[in-house]
Amino acid sequence: MTIHLRLKTRDWDFWTPILLNDIHSENLDLELIRVQSLPDNFAQENDCDAAEMSLSRYAMRRNTGDDQNIVGIPFFIMRGFRNRCILTLQDSPLKTIEDLKGKRIGLSGWQDSGNTWTRALLLEAGVPMESIQWTLSRMTDSDPIDFERGDGFVDNRLVFQDPQETPLVDLLKEHKIDAIFQAFMPAHYYDKDFGLRQLQPDFVSQEKKWFNRWGFVPGIHLLAMKEDYVNKHPEAPSLLVHHLRASQLMWLAKRRKYFETTPWLIESLIEMAKSLPTDWDPIGFEANRKMLDEFARQQYLQKLTSVQRDADFLFPYKGI
């Protein structure tokens, strides 16, 4: 019997084999629904059975018990190191995590998974969160205005909401903040005269050192499914996870073959193979336990949760 499953997800390139029907399953008919931003609570939406979901928002829902009809699956659609996500001006004297102590940092979402991991870099380097003045606003003038982005976290003592939602890039270039935490690079970032750079000039080597210390690549977005769908189709999580992983692996194989899509993609592929184990993006609960325990600890240290949770609490479903 073939089951139909509708998955809301961003348009990651590694879903291309699924979209081209290069990945087949006799038991799963997967419909990918492309979204530009992740739904706040996909369980309340009628047009999907599963969704890519922020790890932070999932964990916070678990913490407050507001996770009705949501099953977290330990399959991480998005992972990423965070050193690369700290930006400053091209001519800034700041070059290390430690240099951020006592500075002004802008970010577009306080509770975001990525920013939680980025603040963890500060804590590891001995930089207290309380030593920094934080400003919440949109990244660029093309991003939507959201005066509620800081609700529950703005205290007007250390954490502020910019009253005009002035773009963070503008605040940085006007020297009103010293750095930005951002998951995705702003528009025109790759233009030669844009004027921003990663805080750490050697951010790649710093990320390798981080991996050697911790042993995982931080999870950012997970796969989540509706509980009533899983109850009706208990085989669905395993079918979906292996279908998605097959697509990712096929896409990686194609990138290794057709590396001329960008001039130096081959260098990145070689460096990844040399610096990371083949299972750097593992599937399953036990393989991700250490990462999830640390994320739960960081949420508690950063006062995103009032109780320190752990991997077992965050992921009661152990079917994968």
Annotate each language-model stretch with its function.
Residues 31-42, 95, 132-170, 269-272, ...:
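Short helix-initiation/N-cap motifs at beta->coil->alpha
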Residues 91-97, 127-129, 228-236:
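Short helix-loop capping/hinge motifs at secondary-structure junctions, enriched
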